[in-house]
């Protein structure tokens, strides 16, 4: 197992053979963190932009596969200061990861292309939650800030560092 400069989130499945539909309730999964030294975002009231489900099948059963994925995403982005949903081969993802490294921030990176069949499913749920179908999909303190272009713009304006400083200040108060 190669060690990278970024922590990754691994998805472990139980009894997932073919890729099921997102709303199938007979499948389950669990998220396992691998070395997560991040400060937790104390702002529990942070909301992720467009966090509504457009799928009536997924919202009709709270125990459905898609609903559990949505819940896991929400939990992940609110419990970690910076989360990047990425793909290892994507140059835009690399640019965003490098930007946070330059800022002295070690984000939680979820490499969707290394999650097997759950990667595309997770990306579909992210699209439903955020309206964004591309990677990187970046969250700061539970708030969806967008992709590479959005993140770079926030950094150029100085807003990204302000968001990170605010998050660190709140984490330091505990």
Curated annotation (Swiss-Prot):
Subunit structure: Monomeric apoprotein and homodimeric holoprotein containing a [2Fe-2S] cluster. No in vitro interactions with SUFE1, BOLA1, BOLA2 or BOLA4.
InterPro entries: Glutaredoxin, Glutaredoxin_euk/vir, Glutaredoxin_subgr, Thioredoxin-like_sf
GO BP: any one term: iron-sulfur cluster assembly
Compartments where located: Plastid, Chloroplast
Function: Has a glutathione-disulfide oxidoreductase activity in the presence of NADPH and glutathione reductase. Reduces low molecular weight disulfides and proteins. Can assemble a [2Fe-2S] cluster, but cannot transfer it to an apoferredoxin.
Residues the entry annotates as binding glutathione: 135, 148-149
Top-level taxon of origin: Eukaryota
Modified residues (S-glutathionyl cysteine): 90, 148
PTM comment text: Glutathionylated.
N-acetylthreonine modified-residue sites: 52
Record's keyword terms, sorted: Acetylation, Chloroplast, Disulfide bond, Electron transport, Glutathionylation, Plastid, Redox-active center, Transit peptide, Transport
Disulphide linkage map: 90-93
Transit peptide location: 1-51
Family classification: Belongs to the glutaredoxin family. CPYC subfamily.
Induction: Up-regulated by cold treatment.
Leader sequence residues: none
GO CC entries: chloroplast
Residues in Glutaredoxin domain copies: 93-171
Pfam families according to UniProt: Glutaredoxin (PF00462)
Documented effect of changing residue 90 to S: Loss of Fe-S cluster incorporation and loss of glutaredoxin activity
Protein name: Glutaredoxin-C5, chloroplastic
Gene3D superfamilies per UniProt: Glutaredoxin
Principal location listed in the UniProt entry: plastid
């Amino acid at each position: 197992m190669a060690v990278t400069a970024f922590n990754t989130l691994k998805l472990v499945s139980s009894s997932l053979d073919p890729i099921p539909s997102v709303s199938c309730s007979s499948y389950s999964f669990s998220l396992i963190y691998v070395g997560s030294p991040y400060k937790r975002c104390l702002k529990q009231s942070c909301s992720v932009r467009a966090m509504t489900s457009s799928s009536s099948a997924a919202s009709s059963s709270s125990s459905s596969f898609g609903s559990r994925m949505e819940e896991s995403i929400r939990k992940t982005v609110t419990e970690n200061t910076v989360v990047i949903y990425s793909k290892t081969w994507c140059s835009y993802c690399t640019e965003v990861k490098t930007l946070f490294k330059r800022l002295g921030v070690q984000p939680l990176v979820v490499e969707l292309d290394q999650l097997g069949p759950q990667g595309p499913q997770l990306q579909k749920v992210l699209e439903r939650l955020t309206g964004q179908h591309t990677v990187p999909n970046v969250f700061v303190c539970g708030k969806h800030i967008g992709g590479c272009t959005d993140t770079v713009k926030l950094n150029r304006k100085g807003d990204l560092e302000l968001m990170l400083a605010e998050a660190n200040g709140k984490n330091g108060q505990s």
